[in-house]
UniProtKB/Swiss-Prot annotation:
UniProt-annotated binding residues for Mg(2+): 108, 247, 249, 251
Transmembrane stretches, start-end: none
Name listed for the protein in its UniProt record: Phosphoglucosamine mutase
The record's account of how the chain is modified after translation: Activated by phosphorylation.
InterPro entries assigned to the protein according to its UniProt record, in alphabetical order: A-D-PHexomutase_a/b/a-I, A-D-PHexomutase_a/b/a-I/II/III, A-D-PHexomutase_a/b/a-II, A-D-PHexomutase_a/b/a-III, A-D-PHexomutase_C, A-D-PHexomutase_C_sf, A-D-PHexomutase_CS, Alpha-D-phosphohexomutase_SF
Annotated organism of origin: Paraburkholderia phytofirmans (strain DSM 17436 / LMG 22146 / PsJN) (Burkholderia phytofirmans)
Record keywords: Isomerase, Magnesium, Metal-binding, Phosphoprotein
GO biological process annotation, one example: carbohydrate metabolic process
Primary role: Catalyzes the conversion of glucosamine-6-phosphate to glucosamine-1-phosphate.
Entry annotation: catalytic residues: 108 (phosphoserine intermediate)
Catalytic activity: alpha-D-glucosamine 1-phosphate = D-glucosamine 6-phosphate
UniProt xrefs under Gene3D superfamilies: Alpha-D-Glucose-1,6-Bisphosphate, subunit A, domain 3, Alpha-D-phosphohexomutase, C-terminal domain
Top EC category: isomerase
Amino acid sequence: MARRYFGTDGIRGKVGEGPITPEFVLRLGYAAGKVLAGADRWAKSGTRPTVLIGKDTRVSGYMLEAALESGFSAAGVDVMLAGPMPTPGIAYLTRALRLAAGVVISASHNPYYDNGIKFFSADGNKLPDEVESQIEEQLDLPLACAASEQLGKARRLDDAAGRYIEFCKSTFPAAFDLHGLKLVVDCAHGAAYDVAPHVFHELGAEVIPIGVAPNGFNINDGVGATAPDALVRAVRANHADLGIALDGDADRLQVVDAAGRLYNGDELLYILVKDRVATDGKVDGAVGTLMTNMAVEVALQEAGVKFVRAAVGDRYVLEQLREHGWQLGAEGSGHILSLDRHSTGDGIVSALLVLAAMKRSEKTLADLLDGVTLFPQKLINVRMKPDADWKSSDAIRRAIAKAESALNGRGRVLIRASGTEPVLRVMVEAENAADALQYAESIAGAVKEATA
């Protein structure tokens, strides 16, 4: 049965519109609390479960945090409040503190007027689809407040930032440090505004922080991983060695070198896999997505590394990594998974892995990527009505068939609906940029007409 509320990355939407309203989020906290409290671990022990709630810097986070806290309390679940904290920080702390679950209030790279809720299980992984379905089923049942003596309590986790900073530093090889490096760190006015600069500074780098003045409304606004031009300018202006850009909840990464060249998740995956081959002698395989550039797939296969494409979404990359028993996977957008370091994508940890690869090899990013030239891709996002039936459109099918025929196996066409917003993503990959642009615009035009 299709889920009504949960998408590929939790529940997300515009604040004040369903489902991101205080009433719904209170019910969501209650429903999640009932599902968690009913789990065997807690039912058999007779103890009360505790969940950890973190958030990014959106002004709506205060309202939604209070609603979630009320819902969990009504279900008889205790709450710990971490305040602003990167999504991967909540995943780590949930596991380290042996809590029942972690909850993040964030809409990641979206504007401030959007927000969302995502859950992590006790082991720091995103909830399986079946557990999210159980929560949706519980949402249909009446809210019955626990008796007064069974209500959950709430308290602050005062040392959340320090714990997470130390965890991030622990993933960097003890044999190396960052002394002598000048880094620009762009925190997108988001959840990592405090912790990220400390991590790199404490490892020895000279840190120039930008995007570290959140006001509730400026998250991802012209800064961060989804707006890397600000980072490029700062790297050049400060003659920095490297620039690191995180998004609003710090689970994705973009990197800029001293020349102002931007490296996306596909390229960083290749660099990390090759570094692992150099240190371990062998990497069995890596996971990308349907959007991963074909040049990376070819280069990895030439290096003897198997490559598998997952559906778009880091949860699906994670599923494929587990299925194959592999460690490294990524999305082009900058979600990078290294399962021997963390259970989920972590922008700060991923940046440290990239820096370690540079230190180990004594090479620049450009040198580490030598011989890999990405195929030009053109991605066009077409907004449409949430219920638009684009799959049955003959016009869209004809446009796709025409493009695929013209590319004749020397490129790819991918059309997919976003899992987080009412957008159809049209991606064309070709041997030259002009063809990619031409066919992407042709298909996007057909989509606009068919879904108007």
